[in-house]
Design a protein with these regions (language model features):
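Alpha-helical interface subdomain recognition
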Residues: 1-134
Length: 134
């Protein structure tokens, strides 16, 4: 969640305060607005899911289905949002002087560490098979 939140901050700062194109702030262009709005919406939804699942976990209720679903959703979201940040920054998105490229690399790592996204999907289906008696 933190990677995506920082990417949203970077997109807003850059497009609303620092970058002009054709005598307008970058954030006044529809495609940039869509990237920022989509990023915030994805982040907000993933945050709600993660917090909801985390608040219900205790020693008696591990909720592995919820945990795997939340990790999968959050890592996918972080990759999408960090990719959007690179898009908003354009060529600067690839430069090491801007943090977007590092954040994107870190977001990709999230889908590997702590259980790959593929492992999370396998766990989700395994839990659903158990729930539905298959």
């Amino acid at each position: 969640l933190g990677i995506a939140e920082r990417c949203i901050e970077i997109m807003c700062e850059y497009s609303m305060k620092h970058r002009d194109a054709f005598s307008k702030k970058l954030s006044e262009f529809g495609q940039i607005q869509r990237l920022i709005a989509d990023s915030y919406t994805e982040w907000s939804a993933a945050r709600s899911l993660v917090y909801s699942v985390a608040s219900g976990i205790n020693p008696e209720n591990r909720n592995s289905l919820g945990a795997a679903s939340a990790k999968l959703a959050a890592t996918r979201m972080a990759e999408n949002v960090s990719r959007n940040a690179i898009q908003v920054l354009g060529g600067y998105g690839y430069c090491r002087e801007y943090p977007a490229e590092r954040l994107h690399r870190d977001a990709i790592l999230l889908s590997i560490g702590g259980g790959t996204n593929e492992a999370m999907m396998k766990n989700i289906v395994s839990d659903l098979r158990r729930i539905y008696g298959v």
